[in-house]
């Protein structure tokens, strides 16, 4: 519906402004890294323009563009599809992996465990990820 389309535009605009502000502040303060946490899986693994990425193409493109201008470690964390994974989801305009960007997706309702994110600004990687398995939930 038109109302749904308007809501997507409003949310995308707000998220985009927030992401731009986060990267700008990181550049101005010479931050050692950026950690962005969000709920939904934006569909990094799907083809641009596909239905699975509906409403997220603009956000992913913004993350790719901002990451190209900020070479320090970036951690993107989310849930939603509820399958633990750690990967390098972003690509440059020349389709090269953006290696300083890592995505971690947390466990979900059918597989309840948790993830510990440690931050060490003195480390080259800045962020470390440890899955925490709850024995009784195996």
Model regions and ranges:
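His/acidic metal-ligating clusters that form di-metal
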Residues: 2-90
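Binuclear metal-dependent phosphoesterase catalytic core
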Residues: 83-138
């Amino acid at each position: 519906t038109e109302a749904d389309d308007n809501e997507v535009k409003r949310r995308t605009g707000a998220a985009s402004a927030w992401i731009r502000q986060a990267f700008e502040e990181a550049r101005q303060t010479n931050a050692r890294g950026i950690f962005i946490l969000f709920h939904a899986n934006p569909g990094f693994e799907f083809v641009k323009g596909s239905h699975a990425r509906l409403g997220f193409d603009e956000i992913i493109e913004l993350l790719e563009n901002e990451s190209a201008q900020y070479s320090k470690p970036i951690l993107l964390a989310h849930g939603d599809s509820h399958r633990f994974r750690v990967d390098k989801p972003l690509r440059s305009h020349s389709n090269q992996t953006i290696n300083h960007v890592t995505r971690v997706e947390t466990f979900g309702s059918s597989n309840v465990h948790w993830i510990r994110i440690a931050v060490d600004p003195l480390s080259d990687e800045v962020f470390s990820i440890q899955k925490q398995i709850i024995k009784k939930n195996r």
